[in-house]
């Protein structure tokens, strides 16, 4: 969890809590890897929000709350502000928002980044007001976006390769918070 801009890990069984980050800047928007050994987060470093990961390094240590050695690594560091990271279901890629409105994906092996949903499809009033979710198979994103140059959000499917965007709702009303079932 995040409190006062720092990341903490807590055991639900033993009421133990450990501070994971300890920086003068903020961290937020955490996302766990499927094996639970890595946490993605947005961190404010050098006057810019970027994407980082922190991992357990010792094989015998299974939980962040009881870890002794952690390794922090930058994932996406650019002049642009980047937020809301999320691991792909297979853990090989990281989705994130650039400048609050552009959905992008970074391949962890190649470090290449591709655009999934362009800026023209979103508008942000504040941090965290944009949502997206990987499909269970990692081939699509469920998104809320602004088609047709209007301000009512529709729910869409955006392909993970960034080549297709399908409007699922075609509604004249505001649609928001879609979920995979």
Q: Across the structure, where does each feature detected by a protein language model lie?
A:
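A flexible loop/linker signature enriched in serine peptidases of the S9 family
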Residues: 2-8, 12-14, 19-28, 34-65, ...
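Asp-box/WD-like beta-propeller blade repeats and closely related beta-sheet repeat scaffolds
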Residues: 67-72
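Hydrophobic alpha-helical and helix-loop surface patches within well-folded domains
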Residues: 164, 176-177
């Amino acid at each position: 969890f995040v409190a006062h801009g720092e990341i903490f890990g807590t055991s639900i069984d033993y009421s133990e809590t450990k501070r994971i980050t300890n920086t003068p800047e903020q961290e937020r928007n955490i996302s766990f890897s499927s094996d639970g050994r890595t946490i993605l987060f947005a961190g404010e470093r050098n006057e810019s929000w970027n994407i980082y990961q922190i991992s357990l390094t010792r094989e015998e240590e299974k939980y962040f709350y009881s870890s002794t050695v952690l390794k922090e690594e930058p994932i996406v560091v650019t002049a642009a502000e980047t937020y809301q990271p999320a691991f792909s279901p297979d853990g090989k890629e990281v989705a994130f928002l650039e400048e609050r409105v552009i959905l992008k994906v970074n391949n962890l092996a190649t470090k290449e980044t591709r655009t999934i949903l362009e800026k023209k499809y979103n508008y942000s009033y504040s941090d965290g007001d944009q949502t997206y979710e990987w499909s269970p198979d990692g081939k699509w994103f469920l998104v809320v976006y602004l088609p047709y140059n209007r301000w009512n959000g529709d729910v869409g499917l955006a392909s993970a390769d960034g080549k297709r965007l399908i409007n699922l709702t075609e509604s004249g009303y505001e649609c928001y918070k879609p979920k995979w079932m």
